[in-house]
Regions:
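Canonical AAA+ ATPase core
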Residues: 94-99, 120, 124, 132-224, ...
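P-loop (Walker A) phosphate-binding loop of NTP-binding proteins
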Residues: 53, 87, 155
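Walker A/P-loop
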Residues: 39-79
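C-terminal helical "lid" subdomain and adjoining coupling/linker elements of P-loop NTPases
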Residues: 225, 241-273
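Pre-Walker A (pre-P-loop) alpha-helix and adjacent loop at the N terminus of AAA/AAA+ ATPase modules
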Residues: 10-56, 235, 239
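Walker B catalytic acidic pair
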Residues: 52, 115-116, 127
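AAA+/P-loop NTPase substrate/partner-engagement loops
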Residues: 68-96
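Conserved alpha-helical scaffold flanking the Walker A/P-loop in AAA+ ATPase domains
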Residues: 36-40, 93-113
Length: 273
């Protein structure tokens, strides 16, 4: 029979999703799939790992997404000497007021770009990943919530490079999506060179959604119908990763849940409810 018509909410979701993708596409040209993946992660409330060579536009993609939403954005450049407190914040004694005060680190933003995460020490990496998982920071026994929506876009250069610490498997599991942008195609490269006077594309776009819009759209996505046949297929996919000699560690149940959440977003973005 005919497919049910999408509700007004789903149509709104589809329009908002596409508006975000189109906006970021002005910054990173000709890379619709990785952009859609990033917007999907934002709508799910998951985090993204971009693994790519230097100069492929990882930072531009993150900033393009951040500038498309009227919320806070912070960038942390990871280095071997970066301390956990440089990321999450620190408690200090205010002598004037005679009390302890918490100074927020750059993790307290709606969109956090964690640049070159594999350059940081394992201790600093795990401080970041803990916040990603818990959505809050605990320093000296006091808990501070991060703002919502909250999404970390981490970048890493491929492992062969010197002076990098590989992310452990357990940490990789905290990311909803791992993707790469890759170099632009020939024609796109020529187009980019034609517009050589634009040095920072991310500055040229304006927000299309607010943080509250994102939270509302997330709610819409959780109500998208998932058929049992789809669940069956997702479980079969996940099980297949555990019985393949080319894969050292198969997907966990977390992977199955992530697939389900992403499928809902993908369906809503396609106008299917």
């Amino acid at each position: 029979g005919l497919l049910p018509q999408p509700t007004a909410q789903v149509r709104d979701f589809q329009q908002s999703f596409n508006a975000l993708v189109e906006n970021v596409s002005k910054v990173v040209i000709g890379k619709t799939i990785p952009i859609k993946q990033c917007v999907t992660a934002l709508m799910v409330g998951g985090h993204i790992l971009l693994e790519d060579n230097p100069g492929t536009g990882k930072t531009q993609l993150a900033r393009g997404l951040a500038n498309s939403i009227s919320t806070g954005f912070k960038r942390v450049q990871f280095t071997p000497d970066l301390l956990p407190s440089d990321v999450v914040g620190v408690t200090f004694y205010d002598q004037k007021r005679g009390e302890f005060e918490f100074r927020e680190g750059p993790i307290f933003a709606s969109i956090v770009l964690a640049d070159e995460i594999n350059r940081a020490s394992p201790k600093t990496q795990s401080a970041l990943l803990e916040v990603m998982e818990e959505q809050k920071v605990t320093v000296d026994g006091v808990t501070h919530d991060v703002p919502q929506p909250f999404i970390v876009i981490a970048t890493q250069n491929p492992i062969e490079q010197l002076g990098t610490y590989k992310l452990p498997e357990a940490q990789m599991d905290r990311f909803l999506i791992k993707t790469s942008i890759g170099y632009p195609g020939h024609d796109v490269s020529v187009d980019i060179l034609k517009q050589v006077d634009i040095t920072d594309r991310a500055q040229t776009i304006s927000p299309v959604l607010s943080g509250d819009d994102v939270m509302r759209l997330r709610q819409v996505a959780t109500e998208i119908y998932v058929d049992d046949a789809i669940r069956e297929y997702i479980v079969r996919l996940v099980e297949a990763t555990r019985h393949n000699e080319k894969i050292t560690v198969g997907s966990s149940m977390r992977g199955a849940l992530a697939l389900t959440r992403c499928a809902r977003i993908w369906a809503a973005a396609d106008g299917r409810a």
